[in-house]
Amino acid sequence: MTEQYQHRARKRFGQNFLHDAGVIDRILRSIHAKPEDRMLEIGPGQGALTEGLLGSGAQLDVVELDKDLIPILNQQFAGKSNFNLHQGDALKFDFNTLGAAPGSLRVVGNLPYNISTPLIFHLLQNAGLIRDMHFMLQKEVVERLAAGPGGGDWGRLSIMVQYHCRVEHLFNVGPGAFNPPPKVDSAIVRLVPHAVLPHPAKDHRLLERIVREAFNQRRKTLRNTLKALLSSAEIEAAGVDGSLRPEQLDLAAFVRLADQLADQPKPATD
């Protein structure tokens, strides 16, 4: 980055700018953007990935919250006909305004760690638009995303993301790849929305509710954590052992519990 493009990272935006050329190249090779691709980059920062994505010929929209970076990015990529910059909060961004065809949008980003989980949930609400996602995240978050049942990393984030997507933990990135260096290790993850949900719930909102309630007190048994939603008999009717703890259940079992809740008679209304 030349002097004219220098910008001090801001702690309140969770900014850690990627500068390691080897890591940048490895990320770009993992994404493998093509001229026909429709790309969205969240939090381009100083444009470390942006330059390579534009070089692929893909149409690239970028969303950046930091107003001070907007003129820097506009100047840096002036004249690039495949570059379109949006200043705003990605957590509030309406992805439908991009006009991308269903299942075509490729999303990438070095996500600020303080908003990564809510941003992923926001993107999952638009999973029908998305072909794949490649993110730099805190390594601990990627381990939770990719976790399986039975361990401490398995929880609400794992289950709800895996309900919608296939998760691939690609590789880890050390603090030295960033300026300033974060205090934690990072990792690259690939999320690919399922073309057909492997375990479709009758109502995914009820699945979210079941999972949230179950993991609010993850050391307790299911018959205790879910007693406000399902009786012990209803848990057993879903083919689930109520004496288990939530981390012992796989995604399919949580979907059965949600479907059991969906099948409950609705209270009569006047």
Swiss-Prot record:
Function recorded in the entry: Specifically dimethylates two adjacent adenosines (A1518 and A1519) in the loop of a conserved hairpin near the 3'-end of 16S rRNA in the 30S particle. May play a critical role in biogenesis of 30S subunits.
NCBIfam families in the cross-refs: ksgA
GO cellular component, one term: cytosol
Keyword list, A-Z: Cytoplasm, Methyltransferase, RNA-binding, rRNA processing, S-adenosyl-L-methionine, Transferase
Species per Swiss-Prot/TrEMBL record: Pseudomonas fluorescens (strain ATCC BAA-477 / NRRL B-23932 / Pf-5)
UniProt cross-references to Gene3D superfamilies, sorted A to Z: Ribosomal RNA adenine dimethylase-like, domain 2, Vaccinia Virus protein VP39
Family from the record: Belongs to the class I-like SAM-binding methyltransferase superfamily. rRNA adenine N(6)-methyltransferase family. RsmA subfamily.
Binding locations of S-adenosyl-L-methionine: N16, L18, G43, E64, D89, N110
One GO MF term: 16S rRNA (adenine(1518)-N(6)/adenine(1519)-N(6))-dimethyltransferase activity
Location of this chain's protein in the cell: Cytoplasm
Protein name: Ribosomal RNA small subunit methyltransferase A
Organism placement in taxonomy: Bacteria, Pseudomonadati, Pseudomonadota, Gammaproteobacteria, Pseudomonadales
EC nos: 2.1.1.182
Gene name per UniProt: rsmA
UniProt main location, coarse: cytoplasm
InterPro entries: KsgA/Erm (IPR001737), rRNA_Ade_diMease-like_C (IPR023165), rRNA_Ade_Mease_Trfase_CS (IPR020596), rRNA_Ade_methylase_Trfase_N (IPR020598), rRNA_adenine_dimethylase (IPR011530), SAM-dependent_MTases_sf (IPR029063)
Catalytic activity: adenosine(1518)/adenosine(1519) in 16S rRNA + 4 S-adenosyl-L-methionine = N(6)-dimethyladenosine(1518)/N(6)-dimethyladenosine(1519) in 16S rRNA + 4 S-adenosyl-L-homocysteine + 4 H(+)
Broad class of enzyme this protein falls into: transferase
